[in-house]
Amino acid sequence: TQNSWELKFYALKPFYRSLANWAIFMTNPATYGWKDNVGTMPPIKVHIHDVPLTHEQRLAAQTATGNLITVSMGGIGDRGKLSQIAKGKDGMPTNKPGYIRDLIASWPSESTLVWCKYNQEQETMESVLEGCASIHGTTPEEARYALIDDFKQQRRMQLVTKPKILGYGLNLQVATRQVFSGICDSFELYHQAVKRSNRVGSTRELNVHIPVTELETPFIDNVLRKADRVQQDTEAQESMFKEIGYDFVG
């Protein structure tokens, strides 16, 4: 492919055979007969929720794309426009914040991470989730520590932020629910955000809720398709290394 490498099917085994001389691909030691430290990790359950568009959103989408219905994501510019319309850009009426508020209210005793994409979207979620913690890119470091501690100690039951801000490294197992108010095409951002609450040592299943309008369906379909592909590739690569069976398997 243009400006990138492509691994042909017939070259898979020779490639991994060469790689296995000095490397190993591993997500679970049990694959190679070693102690399984991750087998007891609870499952991640993903729930997709359909949120109806408002009349104003539908008209705005038709104006932006020239189509009566959304049939594809289009280019980056079109995707960005549709994503902002779906989230109620510039005060446009939207059903999503109220839907998310009511959804979270249905599990009052569970801590929830709410992931946003845009600043305005995050501010809207702050306004409908009374008493929530909210961390922006401009939030001072000391304030971040205090808000995260409030969330971990369940003094605040919801934490609103963005994957680019808190999606990496943090251990937030206290959250047994996650809600993606906004989502983009990046599987890495989605995966890292989800794994903040599903880590070695977790004892409770994680429920991930993704409320989407028809404008956002292509985004989530794309991300989940990437997730399936990553899982398939992971299993195939581990199987290949195991089949090759150099000394590291012994």
Feature annotation, model-predicted:
Residues 115, 161-162, 180-183, 211-212:
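Conserved beta-strand segments of the P-loop GTPase G domain that flank and frequently precede/overlap
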Residues 170-183, 207-209:
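A short beta-strand element within the Helicase C-terminal
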Residues 159, 178-179, 197:
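Short, well-ordered beta-strand core segments
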Residues 185-250:
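A conserved SF2-helicase RecA2
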Residues 113-115, 123-126, 130-166:
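Conserved helicase ATPase core of P-loop NTP-dependent helicases/translocases
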